[in-house]
Amino acid sequence: MKIYVDAKAARDGNGSKESPFKCINDAAQIAQPGDEILVEPGIYREYVDPRNGGREDARITYRSTQMLGAVITGAEEVKNWKPYQGNVWVCRIDNSIFGSYNPYTTYVYGDWYFAGRSKHTGAVYMNDKMMYEAESLDACIKGEVYECSWEPEASVYKWYSQQEGNETVLYGNFQGKNPNEEKVEINVRRECFMPSKTGVGYITVSGFSINKAATTWAPPAAYQDGMIGPHWSKGWIIEDCEISNSKCAGISLGKYLDPENDHYFTYKHVKSPTQMERDAVCRGQYHGWLKEKVGSHIVRRCNIHNCEQGGIIGRMGGVFSVIEDNHIHHINNMMELGGAEIAGIKMHAAIDVIYRRNYIHHCTMGIWCDWEAQGTRITQNLFHDNQRPEFAKQLKGGMMSQDIFVEVGHGPTLIDNNNLLSDASLRMATEGVAMVHNLICGALTCVGEGTGPRYTPYHIPHRTEVMGFMTILHGDDRFYNNIFVQKWPATPFVTLRDSREGTDEENREVGTHVMDEYPTYEEWITMFDMDTDTPDMAKLETAHGSHLPVWAKGNAYFNGAKAWKKETDNLVDTEHEVQVEITFQDGKPVLATNLYEFLGDFSGSMIHSDTLGCAFEPEERFENPDGSSITFDRDYLGEHRGMRILPGPFADKTDAGKKLW
């Protein structure tokens, strides 16, 4: 059945074509498996709470009849501003409009939040641009540049709120503009399109603009909301949407509300947040965390931008998903929020998740795979400018920047055929990573560090059931057929510590030399007395806690990038100066480089799953989610690799000059 919605209809109807509903949520209350909800262009200021899910063979589809013409927003327009002082105006909002959730009394705060409790989930927007929350009315009046912002010219637009009786009083510094003549909105709803109950699966959301919700901080051991999300269900498709201006997360593929483990550390203090993450994994299994019930979502062809925690986030609920062909950019650029959950994509337990053909730039981090990146594949993506600008001061509690961060996982985590162009390409406080056919212009950081005594789960291959827990031994990493270029300065990068005082230095020298202290497989295996069938447990105790081996072959190094001292069959060019830059043709990114002039006749071998072997702890191959083998015979663009195997993401040197996205 087709159900029709039109915000511009003369009056409420019954959902027929002749008499459409005016609100999407009316359709969401009656839709049954197989139904299609057709939504006409218009502004829908409502929260859509689907009552029913579809089935695998009979999805419920919500479709904007005009691409991005139907806008679902968590905001309301405000036109009762009055002059206050200088460039500052004031308005009063009756708190009844907020119902049980007032964003202007709710702080962005919780587990793993490091930037101090001062920002609200509410926000003021002028002409679709989120304004900056001032710490005081005086700061709002002054309207000074915020020194941590990545967009300083926008940071002078300030707002401030306070409570008086049953009213929220909002002050806004509009820098000489009359807010009653501009499009000024405030967010009032926590979500835009998300079931209030779990298990509402097999829904497609296609072609909508979704924006301006008062979402909350969403760490891994808490309820994780977003402007849109499946809320612990299976089989959603979110496609061809524009997702923007969330206070915290844009799309949540995350965790349900567990009242016994919701910001436990923040509220009770007596157990570490790391312990409660482990508990969340185990409790999740009790609450239905199975391949048959949760995950297997698709997020594709979406434009996700200007969200201040993450573009896509989620703990556990995103397993077995495909995230492809998305443009994710300008995430956390305001630098008002800081903590360990911020990235273009931040997911815990990305089991068998595939991230492919995404374009990710100008984010605090590109993709952050935290815990249980088992069977995860990051392939054919373009990353650049995921680094703090030189003019921006680091936010205390803000995170270090890099294209990819893999943290405290056991693998197999596969990173192949990507262009990694920021100053830090991979932060690897983890083990069990394979990097194959990438262009790597930034450093490998945090090698052998950043894990502490944390012990994390690994799983039955291609399942969610826990197989064991182990600390991170580091190593078990593979580097095949990559190109490393020292594009950025090699001097160490000074960073503020996340939640403690002081600074640290982070590596900015490009190359696999950071693995110099790690053994080859042959060196490692000799520690285990393989020539006896009566091993001595006490004797081997030290070996069982030692670094795992590393493999490297077929890599090329330019501009001073350094090779692992035990690597053979590589190219180290110390003579030529190589340039790698992103340029734009007709608004599309193109790689400008001369590196292929200096490869000469150097080539590598075809890489297969059998080449990479198994990740050590889960004993799972680097393979497809269905268990089939991977042959790396297709490049970044999908072109075929023939008899000559060039290092890097392109099968032929001419492909590097093609449009990348």
Which residues does each PLM region occupy?
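Extracellular polysaccharide-degrading/modifying enzymes targeting complex plant/algal/animal polysaccharides
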Residues: 2-232, 237-244, 250-252, 256-289, ...
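Short catalytic-loop micro-motif centered on adjacent basic/acidic residues
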Residues: 38, 229, 311-313, 367-368
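Predominantly extracellular/luminal carbohydrate-interaction, adhesion, and secreted-enzyme modules
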Residues: 226-228, 310, 343-344
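Short beta-alpha connecting loops at secondary-structure transitions
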Residues: 343, 398-404, 421-426, 461-468, ...
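A conserved amphipathic helix/loop scaffold
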Residues: 451
